[in-house]
Amino acid sequence: MDLKNYVASIENYPKEGIIFRDITPLMNDGEAYKYATEKIVEFAKDHHIDIVVGPEARGFIFGCPVSYALGVGFVPVRKPGKLPREVIEYAYDLEYGSNKLCLHKDSIKPGQKVLVVDDLLATGGTVEATIKLVEELGGVVAGLAFLIELVDLKGRERLDKYPMITLMQY
């Protein structure tokens, strides 16, 4: 299945010069959504994952069904003020701005093998921040999974020490 047939490209969104890859058509098609999830699950099974972590918000969309299929838990990584218990946080840069991510302090146990799932690999800043949070809690990042990779932004180079799958490249 060619998943690119289920991604809409929106020029100059969210700002001038950016091409936004809209995955909602993929999410709207049950077979495409299932196929994408199954490809990530196949990758994860080779890496003996204990828990799945996904950054807000689209990391939830693919991370949750992957964790369900693997029979492991899911840990949300959120923006400040969105998690109710004690958190750790990390600041990072986006393709078009900056932000902070937070993780509950008790969400990852030392030594747990973690799969980080997100919709998009651009500069790698969001996932790098997520990795820092996971490793600060003693988790071991066993793999990274992305629906889309924006090759020209070279995020893979920042993350090349981790096993990785991307389902589409632009």
From Swiss-Prot:
Molecular-function GO terms, alphabetical: adenine binding; adenine phosphoribosyltransferase activity; AMP binding
Subcellular location: Cytoplasm
Top EC class of this enzyme: transferase
Cross-referenced InterPro entries: Ade_phspho_trans, PRibTrfase_dom, PRTase-like, UPRTase/APRTase
GO CC annotations, alphabetized: cytoplasm
Entry keyword set: Cytoplasm, Glycosyltransferase, Purine salvage, Transferase
EC number assigned by the record: 2.4.2.7
Biological process (GO), any one: adenine salvage
Catalysed transformations (reactions): AMP + diphosphate = 5-phospho-alpha-D-ribose 1-diphosphate + adenine
Pathway named in the protein's UniProt entry: Purine metabolism; AMP biosynthesis via salvage pathway; AMP from adenine: step 1/1
Major subcellular location class: cytoplasm
NCBIfam families: apt, PRK02304.1-2, PRK02304.1-3, PRK02304.1-5
Biological role stated in the UniProt entry: Catalyzes a salvage reaction resulting in the formation of AMP, that is energically less costly than de novo synthesis.
Family, as annotated: Belongs to the purine/pyrimidine phosphoribosyltransferase family.
Assembly notes: Homodimer.
Protein name per UniProt: Adenine phosphoribosyltransferase
Native source species: Fusobacterium nucleatum subsp. nucleatum (strain ATCC 25586 / DSM 15643 / BCRC 10681 / CIP 101130 / JCM 8532 / KCTC 2640 / LMG 13131 / VPI 4355)
Lineage of the species this protein comes from: Bacteria, Fusobacteriati, Fusobacteriota, Fusobacteriia, Fusobacteriales
